[in-house]
Regions:
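Terminal accessory/targeting
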Residues: 1-145, 167-170, 296-337
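Generic signature of intrinsically disordered, low-complexity segments enriched in small/polar residues
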Residues: 16-18, 23-26, 39, 98, ...
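Active-site beta->alpha N-cap acidic-glycine motif
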Residues: 103-212, 228-232, 237-240, 326, ...
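Residue-identity detector for threonine
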Residues: 3, 57-61, 75, 92, ...
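Short acidic/polar alpha-helix capping motifs at helix-coil junctions
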Residues: 95-100, 124-130, 149-156, 216-223, ...
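Catalytic domains of cell-wall/extracellular-matrix polysaccharide-remodeling enzymes
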Residues: 161, 183-184, 207-337
Length: 337
């Protein structure tokens, strides 16, 4: 625009200095130049305004896109994490009014190995467990099994190997950890969560529930909630809503307290003597025992300290899958409530 204006001014200068120039022509030319300059300035202002509007529009669009990306990212994170939340209940009765008669969970082995027959349990014990929404096997005749590991302490780096096997086989397990285990092996607890396994409460000090209640109701509550605090400080989230009573010991009062704290008590329909690290069963005996008692809806209790369990675990999983069972997590078991 500057070049055009300079050229016009030069013409005006020549005319104004030419003695033969017609002054009326010069005046007319000057008016045209001024008009042209005004039109150029208006065009410049218009272009500048349109540019600013376009820039503002682009900025707004970019901001909106950025907001959408953040929302999308946050939604994705929420979908992946889906953090569990323990739902506490207000007691409907005084806990002290409930009996603290101690029971030891047990199940009846099938009469014949490899029969696929379900395990049995005591009528009183199983009725109490059901009354308080507990678990000991899937209530329906589904071809699924639930492999659970109790984690009181780490031994021989077995849990690392167990997690490696789960990843190799593409299955998920259910772990019950004590407060001591959380403090001792936070790395493995985090790995359990990150790899999609269920992690439940096994109390802080592995206390026998009815014995703790003989001291006070609060003693049992503290043992459960202290483990919760350790777990939440480490992971930033609650336990999954499952608790395994140490030693399989329980009472009606214990079951009520556990339920009101937001958990389902988890027992089992298969277990065997695998917990003594100095007296391990042979691999052939263990494999025959575990796979021989497979049945629909079985909740299998294994101890991670067992080196035998760890060594035969790939064969256990292969046998389970070959026979048409699915290996699932406890959240697939329906509630009784």
């Amino acid at each position: 625009m500057k070049t055009k204006i300079s050229a016009l001014l030069l013409v005006l200068f020549i005319f104004s200095n030419n003695v033969f120039a017609d002054f009326s022509v010069i005046g007319s030319l000057e008016r045209k130049i001024n008009s042209y300059i005004v039109s150029l300035q208006e065009e410049k202002d218009k272009n500048l305004k349109e540019g600013e509007n376009k820039e503002n529009t682009n900025e707004t669009t970019n901001e909106e896109n950025a907001d959408e990306e953040v929302i999308s990212e946050n939604t994705a994170k929420e979908d992946v994490l889906k953090k569990p939340v323990l739902e506490r209940r207000e007691p409907t009765v005084s806990y002290s009014s409930l009996p603290n008669k101690s029971y030891g969970w047990y199940f009846r082995h099938p009469s014949k190995l490899n029969s696929g027959l379900p395990a049995g349990a005591g009528d009183v014990e199983s009725s109490l467990v059901k009354k308080y929404n507990g678990i000991w096997q899937h209530p329906k005749d589904y071809k699924v099994v639930y492999i659970t590991f109790d984690e009181g302490y780490e031994y021989n780096n077995n849990t690392t190997r167990i997690l490696d096997i789960a990843k190799q086989k593409g299955v998920k397990f259910n772990f019950f950890v004590t407060g001591a285990y959380i403090k001792d092996r936070p790395d493995l607890v985090l790995r359990m969560i990150n790899e999609g396994h269920t992690v439940g409460n096994h109390t802080n000090k592995h206390s026998n529930g009815p014995k703790a209640l003989n001291v006070s109701n609060q003693k049992l509550i503290n043992d459960i909630t202290q483990a919760e605090v350790l777990y939440k400080n480490l992971t930033g989230q609650d336990f999954m809503p499952y608790m395994r009573p140490p030693e399989g010991a329980f009472s009606e009062r214990e079951l009520a307290i556990v339920r009101d704290l937001g958990y389902r008590s988890v027992f089992w329909s298969f277990a065997y003597a695998d917990w003594d690290t100095g007296k391990q069963p042979s691999k052939s005996h263990a494999l025959s025992k575990i796979t021989g008692e497979l049945h629909n809806g079985s909740v299998i209790l294994l101890h991670a300290v067992s080196t035998t369990n760890t060594e035969i675990l790939p064969d256990i999983i292969d046998n389970i899958l070959k026979r048409g069972y699915k290996v699932e997590t406890l959240d697939k078991i329906p509630s009784y409530e």
